[in-house]
UniProtKB/Swiss-Prot annotation:
Lineage: Eukaryota, Metazoa, Chordata, Craniata, Vertebrata
Its job: Catalyzes the removal of transit peptides required for the targeting of proteins from the mitochondrial matrix, across the inner membrane, into the inter-membrane space. Known to process the nuclear encoded protein DIABLO.
GO biological process, one term: DNA damage response
Name this polypeptide is given: Mitochondrial inner membrane protease subunit 2
Tissue localization of expression: Expressed in all tissues tested except adult liver and lung.
Encoding gene (name): IMMP2L
EC code: 3.4.21.-
Organism: Homo sapiens
SUPFAM superfamilies: LexA/Signal peptidase
Membrane topology field: Single-pass membrane protein
Transmembrane segments: 19-37
Subcellular location(s) of the protein: Mitochondrion inner membrane
Reported disease: Gilles de la Tourette syndrome: Neurologic disorder manifested particularly by motor and vocal tics and associated with behavioral abnormalities.
InterPro entries the UniProt entry points to: IMP2, LexA/Signal_pep-like_sf, Pept_S26A_signal_pept_1, Pept_S26A_signal_pept_1_CS, Peptidase_S26
Amino acid sequence: MAQSQGWVKRYIKAFCKGFFVAVPVAVTFLDRVACVARVEGASMQPSLNPGGSQSSDVVLLNHWKVRNFEVHRGDIVSLVSPKNPEQKIIKRVIALEGDIVRTIGHKNRYVKVPRGHIWVEGDHHGHSFDSNSFGPVSLGLLHAHATHILWPPERWQKLESVLPPERLPVQREEE
């Protein structure tokens, strides 16, 4: 009887040690390196969720790639919504600081993106709440760079940083 209690105590002790090591490592990884997120809505169609409401894509979000605010035109990024800080949104980077962009439905026809900001838009114009609604976005709101579609399996792919030709900045700041 005493021998079986010793085994149980050793098992519980080993489990607790593993738990108290694994949880901080997992939390740090998910917070600082990468995580996954389900994409909802039509704003990024056809790049993400091409099937509409029938299925949601699940993407890999790489926090490491945006740690120094290193983003490029065409990148698909996750950011904190400028209108609702509780919500994260996924959009494509259209313009970087210093670029002049032709807007779609914004109060100004042309906008020069201020220092420390980016211009983001959804691929499905007219179905996207983006910089055309709220203006340039502070780089401080960047959360992660979407790098791959993980789900559904038939859509496994790397997400390319491609800027639609019709959305090229009118004038680019020299890099």
